[in-house]
Amino acid sequence: MSWDQVWIDVNVATMSPSVSAPYGAITDAAVAVEKGRIAWIGLRSELPEFDVLSTPVYRGKGAWITPGLIDAHTHLVFAGNRANEFELRLQGASYEEIARSGGGIISTVKACREASEGELFELGRKRLNALAKEGVTTVEIKSGYGLETETELKLLRVARELGKHHHVDVKTTFLGAHAIPPEYKDNAETYVDLVIDEMLPAVIEENLADAADVFCENIAFSVEQTERVLTAAKDAGLDIKLHAEQLSNLGGSAMAARLGAKSVDHIEYLDETGVKALSQSGTCATLLPGAFYFLRETQMPPIELLRKHKVPMVLASDYNPGSSPLCSSLLMLNMGCTLFRLTPEEALAGMTRNAAKALGVEDNVGVLEVGMQADFCLWDITTPAQLSYSYGVGVCLEVVKSGQLVHQ
């Protein structure tokens, strides 16, 4: 037997449903990698004989291996910051009040319109590096801070370039319908026409997006406007997803589920009718505790209903300058448990197996099984629950991406 590398003296949280133990755990395990994929995984005592002289063998010293983490919802490419709005909120202003007065997303739009692709790339690279050091091997990056054709394309080009020049896999999402720009303040329908008739075809022509998203909320786009954009995107061959039920229950999630959305995100105000719609369509529910925490919200997502109806729960950072300037996936694991009362196993599934499903890459990453891409992390922990329990100590020892050691 000949492999490219073998890992021994490790415990593995495979996160695979085919392994009955919590976390899909295999203790005292071994993992073999060949051509960037997992060639063998199981008990070390059952490891087939192999050529130890020609095969690199890594000893984990009892550490834990998990799938590479997947951050399935970020707005990672942007310029500027909104620290001044942070101060305003602490003085009593609400997120909606700031948005309606021309702040919020619109202030970041101005900064992004003025920034060059090179400047945006460097800003994005630093943020991507920060996530990568915590074990993230796949990330989603949205546009949405252009709200005009050229800047939306610019943001997506930068996201694509980050994917080409970084070991982290990048999935891109077109979010032209993120907010109504000031120049269309009294004519939202015309802006929706622009998104559908001009922006979307340009995005498709340059192959800049894997999916499309809309912010469906009272301060943004109605359910009817949202459906128009998502339908056009789906017809153009993109996956679809949605920001929904963050501030109120408009029924956007049920509509998106009917259209076959990969995920609906935020969903603090989602009701049981919406949860049932997600369950029936196989749509994931993406939980964003960073925004919940940073905005000091009090309405929790319907976790018990999601469990009851077996909706896959995803956990993501929502990293952005306004409502979640928290560039840490490990922090989200902790917040998912402490704020939303997920179990540590649910939280880790939300950043591995279920996150892969939300991005449509579940056949390639998210669990550790034979044939899957060899994306995994080695952690200095004694139990997988420790990833959610503790935060701030550098527990990520090594990261393997497609069989290559990329972080030590």
From Swiss-Prot:
Its cofactor is Zn(2+); Fe(3+). 4-imidazolone-5-propanoate binds at R82, Y145, H178, Q246, S323. Signal peptide: none annotated. It is found in: Cytoplasm. Zn(2+) binds at H73, H75, H243, D318. N-formimidoyl-L-glutamate binds at Y145, N320, G322. Keywords: Cytoplasm, Histidine metabolism, Hydrolase, Iron, Metal-binding, Zinc. It catalyses: 4-imidazolone-5-propanoate + H2O = N-formimidoyl-L-glutamate. One of its GO terms (biological process) is L-histidine catabolic process to glutamate and formamide. Its EC number is 3.5.2.7. One of its GO terms (cellular component) is cytoplasm. Fe(3+) binds at H73, H75, H243, D318. Binds 1 zinc or iron ion per subunit. The keyword Hydrolase applies. HAMAP family: HutI. This is Imidazolonepropionase.
